[in-house]
Amino acid sequence: RDRRPRRPREDRPITPSVPKERELIPVSEAGMQQAEKLATDFVTGLLAKMGVEGQVKTLPQVECDQLRLEISGPDMGPIIGRRGDTLDAIQYLGSLVLNNALDEHVRLSVDTENYREKRAESLERLARKMAMKVVKAHRSMTLEPMNPYERRIIHAALQDFNGVTTYSTGTEPGRRVVIAPDNSYRNRDRG
C-alpha cells in the first residue's frame, strides 16, 4: 500500500490544543467539617505512631474542594523526609482515608514549615537554570525522577521560556521531566 504523507484537510483549521481547567466541585460545609476532623485525627495519630511531637492545624481554604493542614513542632525534618517523600506519603494516605470515608471528594494538602512553597521556588530556579543550559548547548537534559506535583511545577515554570519545550518520560515512580531545545524557536532565530 502506498504510504504518502496525508495533507491536512483545508476545511478544518489546525488549532493548538488547550488544556481543560479542572472543574471545581464545592464541598458542603458539613462535608468539609467532617473532612477536617477525619484528616486532623488521622495525621495526629500518624505523628504519635511515628514518635514525632507535632500539632496539626487547619489553614484557610484556597479552593472550594481543598482542605489544607499545617503540621508544626520542634523537629519537622522526619515529617518532611528526603525531598518531601514522607510529607507526600502523609498527604497521600490522608487523602485515601478522607475520600474513602466521605461522599464528597476533598483534596488534601499537608505542609510543614512552609516546605511546599520553598520546594516550588527551588524547582522553578532549577527549571530556569537547566533551560538556560539547554538553550546554550542545544541538547536535551533529563531531570531527576519527580512526583506529578513537582513535574507540573517544572512544566509551568518553562511554558513561556523561549527556546525550550518540556515533556515527561518514564513510568511512576521514576517519571522524569525532559527539557529539550525547541527547534521551531531555533529555526525562527536563524531565519
Can you name each region flagged by the protein language model?
Residues 1, 163, 171-179:
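Intrinsically disordered, low-complexity glycine/proline-rich and charged
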Residues 56, 95-100, 106-107, 117, ...:
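P-loop/Walker A NTP-binding module and the surrounding RecA-like catalytic core of P-loop NTPases
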